[in-house]
Amino acid sequence: MQWTNPGHQFDAIGNDLRNFQNIYIYGASDIGKYILKCVTFLKVEISFIDKDLEKQQKGVEGYQVYSPEEFKEKCAEHDDGFIVVFTVNRSNYLNLAKEFIRDGYRENVDFFFYDVFEKFYLNILSVYKFNKIFVEQLSLMVTTYCTLKCKDCIISMPYQKEKRHVPLSELKKDVELFFSKVDFVRYFGPGGGEIFLYPDLDQFLEYVLSRFSKQIGEVLLISNATVLPNEKVLRIIKKYNLTIRISNYDNVKGWLEKRNKFVSLCEENGIVFREQKEEYWLDMGWNSEKKNVKLAYQLFEQCEMPCREFSNGIEYYCLHGHFAEMAKGIHEDQGLDFTKEETDKRIILEYNMGYLKKGFLNSCIRCNGYFGVNNKRIPVAEQL
């Protein structure tokens, strides 16, 4: 989207989302608990609504659970306003939404479906109601070294001209600046390359988690499982109860043996890990012919890339596009400079919601887009 009124793009929506003091999460299931993690940083009164008698008696995650009948009674008592986030399935939501509308409540003002709330409205109400910034996902690149040479690496790692481990002092400076402006990140992680190659990973994780753990929902440690974490890193992972996500590359020669050693090490140390096996990768199209401006604009509107990247005081909207440009020696997408005074919370909100000066990134001109818009499937982890 193209910026037309910077700092005020969401005024109409945001002003409608100011009038509440309580959040009710309808459904105390795993999705409900996920939404809980997304809203606790707001420091507002939160309760669950659920039909389960045991949950009503014991509570969930330390929070009160009301029955639907009790909630209706409480509705009449609220003079200070509330919102409801439904975490039920879509068909149940539609039925409940009809009831709420009949009772005079407004969809996407007084009540929300969880997916729309988390991806859109939470960002806006966080700023307009609480003056706080919520970011879905952010990566800080710690190293451009990797043990694999994937021809179609989504962040063009084999093609980076400068191979380096980012100095710890540089990372600390970026972390301090970022969290001085952003109040909560749902998913935060060191990026690579292969993160377990980074020699100061233990110090980086300790620095981040000892200072900013309350501003982070989950730390993402994504590895190709070819490098065993050292004792110092293992100690930090156990101390903060972190989970390692293993990218499965069992089609790469010799990978499975290394993976088995990696998994054994995790099991021996009681470290939780999850394996993710992709059936295919996407051809991002970095070497394809240029699109015209209209097509680039349309691609950006549809893409909804969730992965942000932060380095040298600048947030880049698209992690993948930024590193593709770096590999080509191009620096056209300037990003959002957090060191400037005019970069206030509403500007950060709008940037993260997809508002740009031109309405698209220069990298979109050569990109095929992310999942949902890109149908160009290619083999996983084909090596150079």
Task: State where each predicted segment sits.
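Accessory C-terminal segments flanking Radical SAM cores
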Residues: 31, 287-384
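A general structural motif
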Residues: 20-22, 43-45, 78-82, 133-137, ...
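Hydrophobic, well-ordered beta-alpha structural blocks that scaffold small-molecule cofactor pockets
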Residues: 1-128
